[in-house]
């Protein structure tokens, strides 16, 4: 099998590793090289900046039989693996011409976790030592990676992640019974956390959940997410909507709506950037977030006693609770308040954000320019779930 054939197999398979967003541009290219576009995604470097990365599997061979995974050993699919030299031949020219600024590398369990992780680290070590590559590397560790390989990864990578896939041991047992929650997932993450506290792994730790594969609720996911941020010092948790794959035990399960993935991302932002506590989130009786409203707006509609807030007097925490205002627009408000008062809606034009939404929850110098509570509730009750939102508040 030549290198292009391998890449045509391994690059599309890596799309299941979630990143910040997709950066590839669609081009009218021959079908044989379409993998090149799908290989470019985004990740976050040590300084928190988004950068384009080359996303690739070193091998799609796997000894495990996870119920949701297209790479499971029971699937009859083309298999391929790259050598360290082949990885260098593919990756480094793209760095040199500016197409990418980093590497996101993962692998299937090709042999066993220790052997497969070792091969991946050998490839990165070759990039670092033989070829002098000093740029960004995000390594996806395998469950059950041994302590020595975690230490080695901490010395080689800017970011390390290990996918939990499910929020609890009970949920994991439904979709991946070969993995032990504590031994194979939490213990390696704890070791990686300890290394990150020494100053290694500058871009931090991350993980990913497959949303909807194990029958978990949004509350299940976000309770665990909160714990991961607090106790294991994760920098980021990603959510990927479950998609059924032919030939797997879950092939007949309905796909998870992408809007659910979006709502979880929005709730994650509330936890990380807006000062919300997990228990404040607007769950329904089944522990799920509403699909037709983003969680910040749903929370605000459920708490009319908190609104409207006076834009000229509210502190930062109060302003961050206002639908339509985010950290950037709130910082502008606080800065502009030192120069004068907000009196009319057109004074908000310089702020950015979803100002039409914010009007329903603020007063300007004591005057309210939004809809009354009944009209506001009626307006939002008519909304239908959307597949994607272009902006976060």
Give the residues covered by each predicted segment.
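Canonical Radical SAM [4Fe-4S] cluster-binding loop centered on the CxxxCxxC motif
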Residues: 48, 56-85
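Conserved, mostly hydrophobic/aromatic
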Residues: 53, 66, 105, 162, ...
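C-terminal extensions
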Residues: 289-318, 345-393
């Amino acid at each position: 099998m030549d290198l292009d054939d391998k890449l045509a197999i391994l690059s599309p398979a890596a799309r299941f590793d979630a990143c910040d967003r997709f950066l590839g541009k669609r081009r009218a290219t021959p079908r044989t090289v379409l993998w090149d576009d799908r290989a470019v995604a985004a990740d976050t470097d040590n300084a928190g900046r988004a950068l384009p990365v080359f996303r690739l599997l070193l091998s799609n061979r796997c000894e495990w039989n996870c119920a949701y995974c297209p790479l499971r050993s029971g699937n009859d699919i083309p298999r391929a693996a790259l050598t360290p030299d082949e990885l260098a031949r593919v990756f480094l020219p793209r760095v040199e011409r500016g197409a990418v600024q980093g590497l996101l590398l993962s692998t299937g369990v090709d042999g066993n976790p220790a052997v497969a992780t070792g091969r991946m680290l050998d490839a990165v070590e070759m990039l670092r030592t033989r070829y002098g590559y000093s740029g960004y590397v995000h390594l996806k560790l395998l469950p059950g990676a041994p302590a020595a390989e975690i230490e080695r990864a901490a010395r080689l990578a800017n970011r390390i992640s290990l996918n939990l896939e499910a929020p609890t041991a009970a949920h994991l047992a439904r979709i991946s019974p070969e993995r032990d929650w504590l031994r194979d997932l939490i213990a390696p993450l704890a070791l990686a956390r300890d290394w990150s506290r020494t100053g290694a792994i500058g871009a931090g730790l991350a993980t990913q959940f497959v949303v909807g594969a194990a029958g978990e609720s949004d509350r299940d996911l976000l309770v665990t997410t909160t714990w991961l941020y607090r106790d294991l010092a994760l920098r980021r948790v990603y959510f990927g909507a479950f998609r059924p794959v032919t030939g797997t035990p879950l092939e007949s399960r309905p796909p998870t709506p992408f809007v659910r993935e979006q709502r979880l991302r929005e709730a994650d932002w509330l936890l990380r950037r807006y000062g919300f506590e997990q228990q404040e989130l607007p769950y329904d009786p089944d522990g799920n977030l509403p699909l037709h409203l983003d969680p910040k707006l749903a929370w605000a509609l459920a708490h009319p006693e908190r609104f409207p807030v006076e834009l000229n007097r509210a502190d930062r925490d109060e302003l961050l609770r206002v639908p339509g205002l985010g950290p950037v627009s709130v910082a502008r408000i606080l800065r502009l308040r030192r120069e004068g008062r907000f009196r009319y809606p057109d004074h908000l034009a310089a702020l950015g954000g979803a100002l039409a939404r914010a009007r329903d929850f603020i007063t300007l110098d004591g005057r309210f320019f939004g809809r009354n509570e009944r009209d506001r509730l009626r307006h939002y009750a008519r909304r239908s779930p959307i597949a994607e939102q272009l902006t976060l508040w």
